[in-house]
Design a protein with these regions (language model features):
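Sec-dependent N-terminal signal peptides
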Residues: 14-21
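Bacterial signal peptide processing site
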Residues: 29-31
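Single conserved hydrophobic/aromatic residue that forms the stacking wall/gate
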Residues: 1-9, 244-253
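First exposed extracellular module after export/assembly in secreted or surface-exposed proteins
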Residues: 37-245
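Generic structural signal for beta-strand residues in well-ordered domains
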Residues: 1-2, 21, 219-221, 252
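C-terminal motif of bacterial Sec signal peptides marking the signal peptidase cleavage site
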Residues: 24-27
Length: 253
């Protein structure tokens, strides 16, 4: 399913203002101030297919049980949806979970599958190759998600949707294979692609996107990391060699 940045930009603007203080909010949960709020990025997991109950898995593998999940009964969360969660930690433990929390806010993060570029549905023209910066990225401990913090230019109006994709480009892979000097079997080659849909580059904006890694799950095992091609805002095409297939410390609870 294609989703544009316009769908999430309005909520993300508020979230990003909070994320500026992310290291301070997430440094630790203060035992002396149980009303202090923390912010984390997590994965929403349904407890069962027939239930609206859910829990959160943090990128360090720990789990959080939302004691007030009924308050979010009217919200539709897909299993595996990524989200920013603002919460208070509660003292009473819940069996089977690392944390018992009271949820204050949930902001969905754009969550997508990796796509393979082809000559039919996912063409070069449709996927696009407009400028974008990948300012920060990390892989969850279970290696199920790659999350990218990015910057791009646009009007940031709701009727101007941009599209993001993490792409397997077999044409480039075949070309690289012809030249042994450009082939590195220890890395998986991917491309972070942006289609601005000809939006006017009026203002610099930021956002977050998470990509599911199930399509390359088997290939990741035994690899050093990922080579991610990005057409940057100011420096042309760059390839980021990402070797830290673990969670950054600033996002640990």
């Amino acid at each position: 399913e294609s989703r544009g940045l316009g769908d999430v930009y309005k909520r993300q603007t508020l979230t990003l203002a909070i994320i500026i203080t992310l290291p301070m909010l997430q440094s630790c949960l203060d035992d002396n101030d149980h009303q202090s709020r923390s912010l984390v990025i997590s994965t929403i997991n349904q407890i069962s297919e027939d239930s609206k109950e859910f829990y959160f898995t943090l990128d360090n593998g720990k789990t959080m049980f939302p004691s007030n999940s009924q308050a979010w009964g009217g919200e539709k969360f897909e299993n595996g949806q990524r989200a920013f969660v603002i919460f208070n930690e509660l003292e009473q433990p819940v069996n089977g979970y690392d944390y018992n929390i009271q949820v204050r806010d949930i902001t969905k993060v754009l969550t997508k599958e990796i796509v393979t570029m082809d000559d039919e549905e996912n063409t070069e023209e449709k996927i696009g190759d407009d400028k974008i910066n990948a300012t920060y990225m990390w892989i969850s401990k279970d290696k199920k998600y790659l999350t990218i913090e990015f910057q791009y230019y646009g009007t940031h109006s709701e009727d101007k949707k941009h599209f993001l994709n993490l792409v397997i480009n077999n044409k480039e892979a075949d070309s690289a294979a012809e030249n042994e000097d450009n082939t590195d079997d220890e890395y998986i080659n991917l491309e972070f692609r942006h289609n601005s849909e000809r939006d006017s580059p009026d203002h610099l904006g930021e956002g977050y996107v998470s990509f599911k890694l199930d399509k390359i799950e088997e290939q990741i095992e035994g690899k050093k990391g990922l080579n991610i091609r990005v057409r940057t805002l100011y420096d042309g095409i760059k390839t980021v060699s990402y070797t830290h297939l673990t969670l950054p410390t600033k996002l640990e609870v």
